[in-house]
A protein has these predicted regions:
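Active-site neighborhoods and metal-handling regions in enzymes and metal-associated proteins
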Residues: 1-340
Length: 340
């Protein structure tokens, strides 16, 4: 049986639950290899099964490593589970309330994070796919001819997305951020129909065989922008150097945040230091002051400190880190990119 399923069955046994219900698309994909396009109910038990939408049956049969059955109705699905003697059901915490109410009258139910804990630790194959996604994204970034084509932010974002697909990506792993000038102080700025200003901040990633990458680079122009860039780079580098198994995620956030505080910009670092990624662009754990998760080998987490000066500009620098005995940066794109 698949190791992921086997581990969850052990969790179920330890907690005296008989089955585990998943509906989140990437959770179903993680367990079975099949990513739903409509809806699906994955029930992990001794004989795991997926109830898939009729529109998805051809895809599900092709991709799934576990049994697939066409979904008929909640009543049919519940009756089949009850006939197997299932009386209690663990559910993923993200299960929609509208789905929960369909099951609550027939089963004892509790939310469990079994799948989240499984997905925290990447296999060598998963890390290889994240690495390939990163290589595609970084190669595409270097192929951009930003300053010579007089493009707008939206056009540069489009070109980067196109290059990633041409280089082997399925698509971008999130809405590509290309922002410049004062708008770069917005961490989630939306590319606009305007010619690029200084500085230029680009946050982008690719998907390869389902797995995401994530990088950010900021290209600066003025002396003040360079001063802020240097502070963020110091925070980025020292946070990565501090990462090792056994520490808490919050410890790394503190390292990054303390560097920025040393220069009196602590109020301008307005988000966490990093997040895990994999099949989803944002997974757990993350480098934040509130995350007490212990760092383990096999985790893949971004480091992305930033300083945002409202009305002036922002600087963010981001790399993805694979954790072994130490922190290994995935990819080889230089932190410093000179366009000006």
């Amino acid at each position: 049986m698949d190791l992921h399923i086997d581990n969850i069955l052990k969790d179920l046994e330890n907690d005296n639950f008989q089955a585990y219900l998943l509906t989140q698309f990437t959770n179903v994909q993680y367990i079975s290899g099949y990513k739903p396009t409509s809806f699906a109910f994955c029930v992990i038990k001794e004989n795991p099964i997926i109830y898939a939408s009729g529109m998805d049956m051809e895809l599900a049969r092709k991709d799934s490593t576990i049994e697939v059955k066409e979904y008929e109705s909640y009543d049919v699905m519940i009756d089949e589970l009850k006939k197997e003697g299932i009386k209690n059901l663990a559910i993923e915490p993200s299960l929609p309330f509208s789905t929960y109410v369909k099951f609550r009258d027939d089963f004892e139910i509790d939310a469990k994070t079994y799948i989240d804990r499984q997905r925290m630790i990447k296999t060598p194959d998963e890390i290889e796919k994240i690495t390939k996604a990163t290589e595609i994204a970084q190669k595409s970034f270097l192929q951009l001819d930003i300053l010579n084509n007089n493009g707008t932010e939206k056009e540069v974002a489009f070109d980067l997305n196109r290059l990633m697909i041409e280089n082997g990506a399925f698509k971008e792993s999130f809405d590509t951020i290309v922002t410049s000038g004062p708008a770069s102080s917005l961490p989630h700025a939306i590319p606009q129909d305007k010619t690029l200003e200084q500085p230029i901040l680009i946050d982008w990633g690719a998907i390869f065989e389902g797995y995401c990458s994530d990088n950010t680079r900021t290209m600066v122009y003025t002396e003040h922008q360079q001063e802020i860039w240097d502070i963020v780079a110091e925070s980025h580098d020292k946070a990565i150097k501090a990462i090792k198994p056994g520490l808490k995620c919050s410890d790394i956030d503190k390292v990054a945040r303390d560097i920025i505080a040393d220069y009196d910009y602590e109020e301008k670092f307005i988000h966490s230091t990093g997040h895990s990624l994999g099949l989803d662009i944002h997974e757990t754990p993350g480098f934040s002051l509130r995350d007490e998760t212990v760092i383990e080998k096999g985790m893949v987490i971004t480091v992305e400190p930033g300083i945002y000066l409202e009305g002036e500009f922002g600087v963010r620098l981001e790399d993805t880190i694979a954790i072994s005995k130490r922190a290994d940066i995935i990819g080889d794109l230089p932190l410093k990119i000179d366009y000006f």
